[in-house]
Regions:
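Short, surface-exposed beta-strand-loop junctions and turns on beta-sheet-rich folds
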Residues: 2, 58-59, 104
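Nucleic-acid nuclease catalytic cores
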Residues: 73-103
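Mg2+/Mn2+-dependent nuclease catalytic core
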Residues: 56-81
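Hydrophobic, glycine-enriched assembly/anchoring segments
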Residues: 253-307
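Conserved catalytic cores of phosphodiester-cleaving nucleases, focusing on short active-site segments
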Residues: 7, 35-59
Length: 307
């Protein structure tokens, strides 16, 4: 349900349906395996659909038995639909979408896809509308604490009572910013590093953007999961059924574009090394808007980053 909810939030998936393998027993059933999802994508009046098998893994390598993939492909051919694999390695925390035909032989009976191969062929941007964001390094939150009362010496330092004297959000130049949309806050929170400055009468704790890259889908995960306790899980079905309660993916993109230079450095729309043949002719995905890609694109064309 997590992947389906993320597809709907990204905005280009106009319909997603969870399929079931619960059918009457039949000898022909051994020929097919029903994938997890059927999804329809619509962009600028063009429509594309696909069957999607959803997988997660602890490590950065995904393996399939050849017979299993053959049954998935057989069902897809029966339905005259392309077959895709959605994969989330738990170590990285985001979803990749790819055609399983890129898999490499592992043994006589199995194939495998490593993270690098999957990332180069990722369709989440061009098909589903995901994009990469690089928050401006140094933008973030600053908490200033002042000591009240005397210090009590301890074996490895001292103990004292502090209180917050100031707290605010600031841009990459350190300028205090009070009118910042929630979407920018969630974006920064999805790519943080922690800094501390300690002095005699207090200390400063800052949570600032590291300069690393995040993705729209990870900003969503941060927004809906930030207030949960460690043992709590995100209720993705509720998220998918109540998208109006969450910032929109297009709204996040607009807010990021409008704060270029202060809070944002780059926005990338990823293009796979090979455009899938099942996509309609002229399918280009999300259009870039000026310097939101880090440069002014000629004739308004989309800036892509090849995997």
């Amino acid at each position: 349900m997590e992947f389906a909810a993320i597809l709907r939030w990204l905005g280009w998936c106009s319909f997603v349906h969870r399929l079931s393998d619960d059918v009457l027993e039949d000898s022909a059933r051994s020929l097919w395996t029903v994938p997890d999802l059927f999804a329809v994508f619509t962009v600028s009046g063009q429509t594309s659909s696909a069957l999607i098998e959803v997988k997660t893994s602890q490590d950065m390598l995904l393996k399939f038995k050849k017979s299993y993939l053959q049954r998935l492909h057989a069902y897809a051919e029966l339905m005259t639909q392309p077959l895709l694999i959605a994969w989330r390695p738990r170590a990285v925390g985001f979803w990749i979408l790819f055609d399983p035909r890129i898999a490499q032989p592992s043994t006589d009976e199995s194939v495998e896809i490593d993270f690098a191969l999957a990332a180069k062929n990722d369709l989440m941007s061009i098909l589903a509308g995901d994009y990469f964001i690089v928050p401006n390094e140094g933008a973030g939150f600053r908490f200033e604490y002042e000591r009240i009362g005397e210090k009590k010496p301890m074996a490895d330092g001292y103990e004292a009572v502090f209180r917050v004297s100031d707290a605010y959000l600031h841009d990459a130049a350190g300028v205090r910013s009070d009118d910042v949309p929630d979407s920018i806050v969630w974006t920064i929170l999805s790519a943080l590093k922690d800094n501390q400055e300690v002095h005699e009468d207090g200390f400063v704790q800052s949570f600032v953007a590291s300069g690393g890259m995040t993705r729209a889908q990870m900003v969503l995960r941060t927004a809906v999961g930030f207030s949960l306790k460690d043992e709590e899980r995100i209720h993705w079905k509720a998220v998918g059924n109540n998208l109006n309660a969450v910032m929109s993916c297009d709204g996040l993109l607009h807010d990021a574009e409008s704060r270029f230079g202060t809070f944002m450095s780059y926005i990338f729309h990823l293009q796979p090394v090979e455009i899938p043949s099942f996509l309609p002719a002229g399918w280009r995905g999300r259009s870039a808007k000026g310097k939101a890609t880090g440069e002014t694109p000629a004739t308004g064309s989309t800036k892509h980053v090849d995997g």
